[in-house]
Every structure is written in structure tokens, then in C-alpha cells.
Amino acid sequence: VEAVRCGRRPFVPLDLLNMENLEACLKGYGLMPSAVPSAELENLNLAWHRLKPWPDSVEGLFRLKERFIVAPLSDGNTRLLVDMAKHAGLPWDTILGADVSEAYKPMPQVYLRACELLGVEPDRAMLVAAHDYDLDAARRCGLKTAYVVRANAHDPSKAAVVKPRDGWE
């Protein structure tokens, strides 16, 4: 992703970047990707499409959807997000993957293009996220921000000690 952000590489979908990283990881462990059946390699790469939501996410999204437009703004490509929604029952109104703006967070065009497509001025939009860099970039583009505490995926017990770096809304 960083090579795209820095302009050293043109935009490519996250699924392709994930596959490249998977292949590099396999090589790092002395395994040649060509030794893995292509269907198995592809299935492993698409694991991102089958992520389980945080336990409070689906209910929270349904509650937000009653009054607001709910749309993920993600570095994932649109198909990845469609698959996640179908797999997890996520009630999104629309999906804004990185392929929509052909850019990755925290590039300003990601946030501004999303507002443009939704017909919303940045100061009337809010990014809800668990990453300070993402919230910081959104705020610099004029969006309101809300920090959601999410524990380390490997140790959910740390949720109580996770704190935002800045004073988000």
C-alpha cells in the first residue's frame, strides 16, 4: 500500500497487494507459492473477505442506519467489502472501497471523493474508526471524527487499555 501512497506504483486493488504479501510471506518461510495449489492459495488470500465482525458491530450499524448513511470507507476493494457484508450481515447503505478513489488512506482524495459521491459536504460527514492516522486524515479533510475502541485482534482483553492518541469526537 505504501508504494501506491508514495506514487512509486500505480493503484492496484488490495486483493492483489494481499496476494503479493502472502507469496512473499510464504517465500520467507522457505515455501514456494507455486508449490501451493492455486485454488488453495486464492482461498487463503480471500480470507479477508470472510472476516467476522466485532460482536457489537452489526447491531450498532443497524442503529446508526436508522438516522444516517452507513458506508464503509475502506482500503479494501469493493468486492472484498461486498463479500464481508454478505458473510457477516453488515447493513451498509453503500460501499466505498479504495478502488472508488483509486487511492489508499490517509490520502485526502479517499475522504473527499467519498463525500462527493454521497453528496455530503465534508463538515456534514463523520468518519468512525479505530485508527488515529485515519481519523487525523479525515479531520484534516474537514470531516467530523469518532474514535471506536477496538482491542488488539490477538488479545481482545486489552480493549480497556486501548486509548486514542488525540481527542476525537
Please report, for each region that a protein language model flagged, where it lies by residue.
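Surface-exposed cleft-lining segments at the edges of enzyme active sites
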Residues: 42-50
